């Protein structure tokens, strides 16, 4: 399939925000969909690619203040598909990584509505690429763990990790929140050494990217940028602390992104 089909819901990953990091499949669906239901974190640069006759609606939720309930999102998807429209449910990053896609898939199945999941570049992979550092390493990081600092309603007091964290793991915390001190305490309880590198990166792989780095013993007082933020922890991040991945090198990557987004004629 090259374009969208009527009566189908497409759960599409928008990637980290740079339109050039969209998949070809995602772009074709945006150009042909009748209805686009998007999260708040999907930037205007991506929404600008939507067909001009499509109905575009924000259904995002931020800081616990939903514009629409999850059940309401389900209803919009199902009603639009049953009306014979092609529907793109556009999510930041990858739909299947902390994107509540499981709930939406269950609702579509229960309603006997056809759907397709279109993967996107998740923020963790975008962050590693933007920083020029691999998330895994043959010698120091043979495991990669994704977790979230934002749990289901009423469970935000739960620790990000239970038990001992493997020494050879890179931990990626999605939505860590502002209280990095709490996370630092939980990492210590999980057996993470004080000299392990930590990097908080905001708006990874976009023109708004910023990042700060410290060892675990400095994480308590570290201030990260505006949401969305990722916290990366592990020996694989040591190059940032040691200066192997310089801030100047990172700025070059961001400047190139800025040229692509601001100037359509840039090579």
Residue ranges with predicted function:
Residues 73, 119, 123, 179:
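Catalytic-loop motifs flanking and including active-site residues across diverse enzymes
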Residues 94-167, 210-213:
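Class I SAM-dependent methyltransferase SAM-binding "motif I" and its flanking Rossmann-like core
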Residues 6-9, 82-87, 100, 143, ...:
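A contiguous loop/helix-start segment that scaffolds small-molecule binding in enzyme catalytic cores
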Residues 54-61, 112-116, 135-142, 191-200:
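Short hydrophobic/aromatic-enriched beta-strand-loop microsegments
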